[in-house]
């Protein structure tokens, strides 16, 4: 019986092991301007004297859908509307870590809209996270992505848009690129991949893939297949790999690798500047 169940259990066990780093509390620091990796990591250190704070606010993107977290672009008051980055949370949900990521993007001059695919819920331990992730309805989540994109274009008047996500959110950043032909760029941090060129050919956006060589849930062989699929589909892409483990860019997790995270963030900043601001 156990041997027959292994093919079913193994993918779930790998996902649980890869994402198991439990979130830590964070403080209410309010950075101005671009954030270095050290400054970003400091947001996740426990400070019991100050409640968690964020620079943005929750907004309704469509009736009946969970609110999204909106962090307006910093330093653009009175100027033209800023490009918008759709932010997709990890398997923990739309928690403080993701709000800090949105604020970090806002510090770069982009308006960040963090979507909630968990209906307002978030996890405090890996078992809760796995249950929430498994309960996600694909069709309902696609509606949320489409509503977020519509809000970005019609309400925020975004001249350009991109998506970014990590782990669970990395997969959904890829799904954003498949769903939204008008998307300019998609950043995928170690998310579940699709390697079928026929499906990938629907992507019009440029793709940046960030992966970890020690990742057992998204192993290098899967990244190789993804890269081959993108090439065969004619998708403009670049792939970067780091000698780190899954979730290495999350300062609130136990697998955080500051060197790899800093290098990946440098690539992400450059990529977003190219696809959203038109910088070389």
What are the residue ranges of the model-derived segments?
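C-terminal motif of bacterial Sec signal peptides marking the signal peptidase cleavage site
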Residues: 16-18
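Acidic catalytic loop of the alpha/beta-hydrolase fold
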Residues: 214-218
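Serine-hydrolase catalytic machinery in alpha/beta-hydrolase-like enzymes
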Residues: 22-154, 250-252
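C-terminal catalytic histidine-bearing segment of alpha/beta-hydrolase fold enzymes
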Residues: 231-280
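Short beta-strand/loop motif that positions the catalytic acidic residue
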Residues: 209-211
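Short alpha-helix in the alpha/beta-hydrolase fold that links the catalytic acid
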Residues: 101, 219-229
């Amino acid at each position: 019986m156990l041997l027959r169940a292994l093919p079913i259990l193994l993918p779930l066990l790998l996902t649980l092991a890869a994402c198991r780093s439990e979130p830590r509390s964070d403080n209410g620091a309010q950075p101005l301007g671009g954030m270095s990796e050290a400054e970003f990591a400091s947001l996740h250190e426990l400070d019991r004297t100050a409640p968690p704070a964020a620079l943005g606010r929750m907004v309704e993107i469509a009736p009946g859908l969970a609110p999204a977290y909106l962090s307006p672009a910093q330093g653009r008051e009175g100027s033209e509307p800023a490009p918008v980055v759709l932010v997709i949370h990890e398997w923990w949900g739309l928690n403080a870590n993701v709000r800090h990521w949105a604020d970090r993007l806002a510090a770069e001059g982009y308006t960040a809209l963090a979507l909630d695919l968990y209906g307002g819920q978030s996890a405090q331990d890996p078992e809760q996270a796995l249950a929430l992730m498994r309960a996600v309805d694909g069709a309902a989540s696609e509606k949320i992505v489409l509503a977020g994109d519509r809000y970005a274009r019609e309400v925020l008047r975004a001249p350009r848009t991109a998506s970014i996500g990590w782990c669970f959110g990395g997969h959904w950043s890829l799904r954003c690129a498949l769903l939204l032909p008008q998307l300019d760029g998609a950043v995928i941090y170690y998310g579940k991949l699709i390697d079928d060129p026929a499906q990938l050919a629907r992507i019009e956006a440029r793709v940046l893939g960030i992966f970890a060589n020690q990742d057992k849930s998204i192993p290098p062989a899967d990244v190789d297949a993804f890269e081959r699929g993108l090439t065969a589909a004619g998708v403009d892409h670049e792939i970067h790999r780091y000698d780190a483990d899954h979730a290495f860019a999350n300062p609130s997790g136990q697998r955080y690798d500051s060197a790899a995270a800093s290098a990946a963030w440098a690539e992400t900043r450059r990529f977003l500047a190219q696809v959203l601001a038109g910088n070389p």
